[in-house]
Amino acid sequence: MQKRHAHVSPTLDIMAKKIFSLPEVTAAFIRDILELDVADAQIVEGSQPHGMAYEEDDLFSTAVDVRAKLHDGTEVIIEIQIRKQQYFLNRFHYYLANQLVENVQKLRQQGQTHKMYEQMEPVYGIAILEKSLLLDEEGAINKYWLTNSRSGKQLKAYFKNGKHQNLLQVAFLELDKYNK
């Protein structure tokens, strides 16, 4: 039994963007991978402009494959990687950290400087990888967040409305391990 069309891969950018353009599909995927209580997801524009010009560029910007905003304000970046790249993990960290900074800068521009840290929303990431990146891990899905190195206790931040959760969390879905 063939599980998917031989010439169409869900990791191709155009296919992935089509699949994740449906909010209910994106919400279900995030719910299953990150194990979050997701009521719905709004798909938002994925470009990340940077206010600082670099030598060869007038305005530097990056684009993530899919960016969703959840009902509680949490943002989730979904990045699809077909080829194994040596610095993918570095780039993925950059996307998440950059989104946190961009969100705080928006609050600052709105004049919310005294409450901008209270108003911050978590940013989570899911990387869908065609080829394994985490060779020492056996499972197809692996999740990471900040923890105490001795106790293993999660480092959670406080947010508006009394939320107490991780500020950053990442998950990797390695497709070549999925059917093993």
Label the model's feature ranges.
Residues M1-K180:
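Elongated, amphipathic alpha-helical interaction scaffolds
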